């Protein structure tokens, strides 16, 4: 079993609520986007949606901090905004209804690219098809992708794991 799988199982065991489980996974994904070389070269910061609204909302005329399924927002070196939804669904299949609010809430002109990060590789066909030809585009980062991270989760100094 991989270090990441062990960590996800630890989160599952030690968190008391689904909300805590989700928040722990979101915090892990902040570190993933800031430390995984592919993303670390692209992003200057990754913020919770509420913190992003606090920092950039006035400039974009956004006052509502309700996230509508957006958990995090990554800010590119060029100043673009990429919303991220984090799904910690270890044993559950992701259905279209699980991502509908994110797709609606993140389909704004100030977002140029979107991510859904999931701790599963199991998606319904309807969920997969809802991402095709979406605008802005949506990329998925699956458990398999996370497992293939270049971050050494077995190292003594663990930036995210």
Q: For the regions a protein language model found, what residue spans apply to each?
A:
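ATP-dependent helicase/translocase motor core
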Residues: 4-16, 49, 53-62, 100, ...
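Catalytic centers of nucleases
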Residues: 21-110, 119-129
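Glycine/serine-rich loop-strand microenvironments at binding/catalytic pocket rims
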Residues: 1-23, 27-31
